[in-house]
Amino acid sequence: MGCSSSSAVKPVSASVATLLDAGKSKSLGSFQVALIVDPKDARLDEVRDVLARSFAGTTEAAPDSATGWVYDCTVEIGKPLETLSEARVKRFAWLAKYMVQFAMIRNGVFALLDTEGKVVAAAVVVLPGAPTAEVGCEQMSILNKVGMPPPAGDNGAACGGADSRDGKLANAMGRLHKAHAPTSLPHMYIYCLGVAPEAQSKGCGSALLGWIGEAADADGVAVWTETAGAENKAFYSSKEGFTVKGREAVVAKGDAKKGEQDSTLELLGMLRPAPLPVAAPLSS
């Protein structure tokens, strides 16, 4: 039996066209946010690099809590890496390619540029009305473009393997989204948001998240995301008023024969509510 791909569907949020000059960029004070829709745009390489390094972590910056758990099978959240292996670099470079390809189909690649035009942060955002997960043959189509994931080295084989944990995480994200996001209404979905390690703690993430909130308000919709770790929870709640709507324990079973223990990640589903409708003025 054949199947169809959604690769030709590219929804555009009305707010994006309004807020971004010529539908492409907008000044945010010290930064500029850009919507990237051209697959030949040279900045896509910078976006992939920023997302890969942000999620992988470095010896000076902690990895992303959720994808770090997928790779390492540990929940040492907030700690920089002791070493950065070549296998880790390759795995997260592949992950960034996959996420960007997923986003390009949905017109959802946003880059934050500094005053020199360098990408310092990026987000994959599913705009209102677009599918929040791969549909039909889409996953196959993306894999045909980016290739299969390279093996996870380091501790990747523990607790059933990184690919198994990746599937568990994706399923948990889907369950949280279905159970707690406003799925009956159009909403924005932050699939991922990352800041270059060297640009962290400089307002980049706040600026990009703030713009996403501005765009959502212009569309009159809520914003949903999944995340893990106290630091990420605090970032979303303090910057844009996200609240936790659901939690799910994602468990990777350890092999007792190998001396492995189970590893559990607490995944959070967080929501920024839609703006209240503006009341019509009272007539005299």
What are these model-derived regions, one by one?
Residues 1-12:
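Short acidic, low-complexity intrinsically disordered linear motifs used
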